[in-house]
Amino acid sequence: MEALVYTFLLVSTLGIIFFAIFFREPPKLPTKGGK
């Protein structure tokens, strides 16, 4: 059960960091049908 909690914390932390970097600077990846 602890493994599930640690995995959730790890994924949530990576998600927050990813979104922080993604929204801080404009995405350089070519988006299909993006805004």
Curated annotation (Swiss-Prot):
Main location: plastid
Annotated localization: Plastid, Chloroplast thylakoid membrane
UniProt cross-references to Pfam families, sorted A to Z: PsbT
UniProt superkingdom: Eukaryota
GO (cellular component) term, any one: photosystem II reaction center
Membrane-topology descriptor: Single-pass membrane protein
Keywords of the record: Chloroplast, Membrane, Photosynthesis, Photosystem II, Plastid, Thylakoid, Transmembrane, Transmembrane helix
Cystine crosslinks: none
Gene Ontology BP, a term: photosynthesis
Segments crossing the lipid bilayer: 3-23
UniProt subunit comment: PSII is composed of 1 copy each of membrane proteins PsbA, PsbB, PsbC, PsbD, PsbE, PsbF, PsbH, PsbI, PsbJ, PsbK, PsbL, PsbM, PsbT, PsbY, PsbZ, Psb30/Ycf12, at least 3 peripheral proteins of the oxygen-evolving complex and a large number of cofactors. It forms dimeric complexes.
Database matches in PANTHER family: PHOTOSYSTEM II REACTION CENTER PROTEIN T, PTHR36411
Role noted for this protein: Found at the monomer-monomer interface of the photosystem II (PS II) dimer, plays a role in assembly and dimerization of PSII. PSII is a light-driven water plastoquinone oxidoreductase, using light energy to abstract electrons from H(2)O, generating a proton gradient subsequently used for ATP formation.
Assigned protein family: Belongs to the PsbT family.
Protein name from the UniProt record: Photosystem II reaction center protein T
